[in-house]
Regions:
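Short alpha-helical transmembrane segments in multi-pass integral membrane proteins
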Residues: 1-27, 84-151, 193-249, 305-370, ...
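Residue-level signal for short hydrophobic patches within transmembrane helices
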Residues: 16, 20-39, 43, 65-72, ...
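Transmembrane helical elements of multi-pass membrane transporters/channels
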Residues: 25-44, 145, 179, 208-212, ...
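Transmembrane alpha-helix boundary and packing residues in multipass membrane permease domains
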Residues: 30, 34, 46, 63, ...
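Helix-terminus/linker motif at the lipid-water interface of multi-pass membrane proteins
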Residues: 35, 39-57, 126-133, 189-196, ...
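Small-residue-rich hydrophobic transmembrane alpha-helices
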Residues: 56-116, 153-172, 279-343, 374-396
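Hydrophobic transmembrane alpha-helices of multi-pass small-molecule transporters
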Residues: 68-71, 183-188, 213-217, 289-292, ...
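Short runs within selected transmembrane alpha-helices of multi-pass transporters and secretion channels
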Residues: 77, 146-164, 172-180, 201-214, ...
Length: 460
């Protein structure tokens, strides 16, 4: 099938399929991908936790490194993806290929820079991310293979997002799920079978992500996509690079500040010992799993919102946002209820240490309550990013981990002690919800007015 035929087929799918069927069709593969990714993160936490409390703390330190990798990948992936989707919505396939090529080759180059700088300064880098002296050997051993694979990991995130924004979430899922399952299988083999310890966890992650990269790249090389990767198509215009960076700024704010927030959380927790760092790390990994459902549904919304906004079908954008909020909320209620009932056993599964549980359990309960606000936060952020409202999207993306969390993590532990460490994230979530809701409601009303104006223009 030619690129033009693929584009026509995809246009009909994205602009005519009923919204619930379309969103769920795109969201289910994305949710599965994110759940598998979260499961292999939890698997790392579980297997590393069998070594020692200090090793378990290293998972939290390397999580901040992973957040940096994700920030770079999502910035380029979301930044180009929203433009690609809107370009396909307006039937401009040449622009789609240009932005896809630019983001992919830029990701490879950025990954090489991160790998070189990170490996050259590894011990200092890990201390900067919040490591203690006892955690440091584990953190360095874990991080080294991941840094080596950073160029492929960042590029994989770009390809994953381009596939999703083209409406091909199933293809994106194949690459991510394969990598995730492989990671889970390889963890115990490298860590215990080969006796490599925390270094084995890093090698398993790096190897599985490299295989995921190869699978995702094959989708583009085999002509499964409308946009393609060509060196000659990489833009020479600073304005178009700027468009990618502006479009990806919300993702950079979200993921970059998550890295900074994770670093500050580790620093605040390490005042209370390795058990506190390990406990907060376990809670963060569990909630990464839970929140991946809301984010997965939200990522199902993104190509629908971007494509239909580009096609000037504003009512479908509004319907998609409202449906996504309802679906995400229902899924979170079920998950949170199950986790609350089994919270103690869930935490002990990852590290059966009374000191770790004493820190993790209250933090877990606080976050269970606040996470039910996430559907509004996620939909507001992703809707604005998808339709090209980068300013609003960036501001809202920076609220959760930046505008609110960073001041709270600097202030509350000084005034409330360990309770301040445990309550920072849920309090930041409440404030972010309060800010996001009026932004979203105003835009939904604006979409209704834009749809009425579009109908009047078509009728005249």
């Amino acid at each position: 099938m030619s690129a033009d035929e693929l584009n026509i087929q995809q246009y009909k799918k994205m602009t005519e399929t009923p919204i619930p069927k379309l969103i769920l069709g795109l969201a289910v593969p994305t949710i599965l991908s994110m759940l598998i990714t979260s499961i292999y993160n939890l698997a790392d936490t579980f297997f590393v936790g069998q070594i020692s409390t200090s090793a378990s703390g290293a998972v939290g330190i390397v999580s901040s490194l992973m957040a940096i990798i994700q920030a770079l990948g999502f910035t380029l992936g979301h930044g180009s993806g929203t433009i690609i989707s809107r370009s396909l919505g307006s039937r401009n396939t040449e622009a789609a290929t240009r932005f896809a090529s630019t983001s992919f080759f830029t990701a490879l180059a950025v990954g090489v820079v991160l790998a070189v700088v990170g490996l050259a300064t590894l011990p200092s880098f890990m201390m900067l991310l919040g490591s203690t002296e006892t955690i440091l050997p584990h953190a360095c051993a874990y991080a080294r293979p991941i840094l080596i694979a950073a160029p492929l990991m960042i590029s994989s995130l770009v390809m994953n997002n381009i596939l999703r924004y083209e409406g091909k979430a199933n293809f994106a899922m194949i690459g991510l799920v394969t990598g995730g399952v492989l990671n889970i299988v390889l963890d115990p083999i490298f860590m215990f079978g080969l006796g490599l310890g925390t270094a084995g966890a890093g090698i398993a992650t790096a190897l599985s992500q490299s295989i995921s990269f190869c699978i995702l790249l094959s989708m583009f090389l085999r002509g499964k996509t409308v946009s393609q990767f060509r060196i000659a198509a990489v833009t020479r215009e600073a304005r178009e690079f700027g468009m990618i960076l502006v479009g990806g700024a919300p993702s950079f704010g979200r993921q970059g500040l998550q890295s900074i927030g994770g670093m500050l959380l580790n620093i605040a927790a390490r005042s209370y010992g390795d058990a506190a760092v390990a406990g907060m790390s376990i809670v963060s990994r569990i909630f990464m799993f839970i929140i991946s459902v809301a984010i997965g549904v939200g990522q199902g919304l993104q190509p629908v919102a971007a494509f239909n906004y580009g096609a000037r079908k504003f009512r479908r954008v509004r319907q998609a946002a409202i449906f996504t909020m309802g679906a995400a909320f229902c899924m979170l209620v079920v998950l949170v209820s199950l986790c609350w009932v089994n919270s103690d056993a869930l935490i002990r599964l990852f590290r059966d240490d009374p000191e770790v549980t004493a820190v993790a359990l209250p933090a877990f309960h606080y976050q269970c309550l606040a996470i039910l606000l996430q559907p509004v936060i996620v939909v507001a952020n992703m809707t604005f990013q998808s339709v090209g409202k980068a300013g609003r999207a960036t501001f809202l993306a920076c609220c959760r981990q930046g505008v609110f969390f960073i001041p709270l993590i600097l202030i509350l532990p000084r005034t409330l002690g360990l309770v301040g460490v445990e309550t920072c994230q849920p309090i930041a979530d409440v404030f972010t919800f309060i800010v996001s809701l009026p932004f979203l409601l105003a835009f939904l009303n604006q979409l209704s007015r834009m749809d009425d104006a579009e109908k009047a223009r078509s009728a005249s």
